[in-house]
C-alpha cells in the first residue's frame, strides 16, 4: 500500500524524519511530497527541500521524494496513494489536522488519514524553530538531519 506524507518541510526536521522512518515500516511505499505553496515565501526552494529530504532518507529504500502543487487529495489519487500520513507533535496540531482530515475525506472518501504521534524527543521541534535557532547562530544538529545543517549554515553563517 502506498502512503503519502505531504508538507512544506522548510526545512525537514528530525521530527519529520522520525515520521517518515516509522511510516516506511508500515507501508510498502511512502511518497514524501513537498508542497509548492504560492502563498508562502519559503527559505529553501521546493527543489532544495526535495534534495534535502532525498539525502536524509537515502537509507530508506521504499521512500520516494517529489514536489507537488494543488490539492493533496488530487496528488494522492494521481500517485495511487491510499493513506495520507500526518505527524502530531502537540494537542493543538490535532485540531488543525483533524479539520484537514475531515475535509480530505469529503473530497476523497477513498483516502484515509493516519496520524503518527511524534517521538517525545522531537515534540517541540518545528521548521520555524529550526530557522530561528539557525538564524541566531545556535546549535541545530539535534534538530535537523546533516544535509540540512550544511544548507542552513550556508544560509546563516556563524558570526
UniProtKB/Swiss-Prot annotation:
ATP binds at residues 8-9, 16, 87-89, 97, 122-128. The gene is coaD. Homohexamer. InterPro entries: Cyt_trans-like, PPAT, Rossmann-like_a/b/a_fold. This is Phosphopantetheine adenylyltransferase. Its EC number is 2.7.7.3. It comes from Synechococcus sp. (strain JA-2-3B'a(2-13)) (Cyanobacteria bacterium Yellowstone B-Prime). GO terms for biological process: coenzyme A biosynthetic process. Its cofactor is Mg(2+). It comes from the Bacteria. Belongs to the bacterial CoaD family. GO terms for cellular component: cytoplasm.
Amino acid at each position: 500500500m502506498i502512503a503519502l506524507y505531504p508538507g512544506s518541510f522548510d526545512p525537514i526536521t528530525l521530527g519529520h524524519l522520525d515520521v517518515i522512518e516509522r511510516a516506511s515500516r508500515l507501508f510498502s511505499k511512502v511518497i514524501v511530497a513537498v508542497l509548492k505553496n504560492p502563498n508562502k515565501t519559503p527559505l529553501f526552494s521546493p527543489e532544495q527541500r526535495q534534495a534535502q529530504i532525498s539525502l536524509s532518507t537515502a537509507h530508506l529504500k521504499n521512500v520516494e521524494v517529489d514536489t507537488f502543487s494543488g490539492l493533496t487529495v488530487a496528488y494522492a489519487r494521481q500517485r495511487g496513494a491510499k493513506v495520507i500520513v500526518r505527524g502530531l507533535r502537540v494537542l493543538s496540531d490535532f485540531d488543525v489536522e483533524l479539520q484537514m482530515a475531515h475535509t480530505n475525506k469529503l473530497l476523497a472518501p477513498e483516502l484515509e488519514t493516519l496520524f503518527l504521534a511524534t517521538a517525545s524527543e522531537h515534540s517541540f521541534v518545528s521548521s520555524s524553530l529550526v530557522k530561528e535557532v539557525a538564524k541566531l547562530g545556535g546549535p541545530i544538529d539535534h534538530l535537523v538531519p546533516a544535509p540540512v545543517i550544511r544548507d542552513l549554515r550556508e544560509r546563516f553563517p556563524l558570526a
